[in-house]
Amino acid sequence: MTRSWMESEIRSQPALLARLAEGAAPLAQELARAISRRHPRFVVLTARGSSDHAAIYGKYLLETDAGLVASLAAPSVYSIYGGRPDVRDALVIGISQSGQSPDIVTTVAGARAGGALTLAITNDESSPLAQASDLRLPLQVGPERSVAATKTFTAELLAVWLLVQAMAGKDLDSAANLGSDAEASLASAQRTLSGSSLGDPASPIVVVGRGYGYPVALELALKLREVGRRNAHGFSAADLLHGPIAAVQAGTTAVVVGAAGPTSSSLRDGLAAIHAHGARSLVISNDPELAWEASLAVPVRAAGESLSGISLALAGQWLALQDALTRGLDPDRPPGLAKITRTL
């Protein structure tokens, strides 16, 4: 029996992701062909909140796998300052679960008017963002009842992954086992974290990632703030050592998220610095060496580093949910938040 919409939608994700991985692959390849005909020289991604973290994930994918320079737009350039940058050779991707935030819609519409090819990734095919775009990649995960983004966030990660792999001419079969990987990762989080909290609500939390784990770290920190009212902040493992490590001390909890791969040594360096400052650590990873060094570890399963963010995010959502529930907080009613946020 589930106790909240957030829990229900976390549990629903393995099946939804498996369906999206299979069902959206042909559309991703069709969109990649349409994009190829325009020969974009660079990509601009625009989003807010959780979707902005999915956009950062997209930046890593686009630059690493597709060889395209990718940047994140500042929506106020279009929506407040009335700027019109030269985007004639760009692919502009708007990411929004609702597709209704005016600043994201204005950015995409302005870029389209300026000659860019535009694409919307959204859970609402009839939304203003979808209507403002040349191309659309729908998430099709059904209405999201949880105020804090759960299934739409991991679906955005998968949608971006499918699109970029198709743009790069790569095989999409790596996602074939995504549903079972997500299910195994969620089960691992449930075994390790159910009934757990991150300790004293007054103590700070740092969430650390690198590479594909970095946007997941930002997202987990946001979830801990949203549903747990935590003083949580996300950092790159590299940036952590450029100053923020000074604020880490005994009583601080550090959550490290990342997959086995080229960033592992950087994450281990960050974890060593965290321990040297007297903080306790929780590691979410498929890297046994990184997990071995943690105070507590949640092993996850992923088919390669570029897909790992989905399993990492799913385990992180369960952590945020459990931290809120064990302290008597209602994850479906975080104060001051609304499901659809409209900013200019």
Over which residues does each language-model region extend?
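Active-site phosphate/pyrophosphate-binding segments
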Residues: 2-40, 135-253, 263, 327-344
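Glycine-rich phosphate-binding loops that contact phosphosugars or nucleotide phosphates
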Residues: 36-184, 210, 245, 253, ...
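Peripheral docking tails and interdomain loops at the edges
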Residues: 302-344
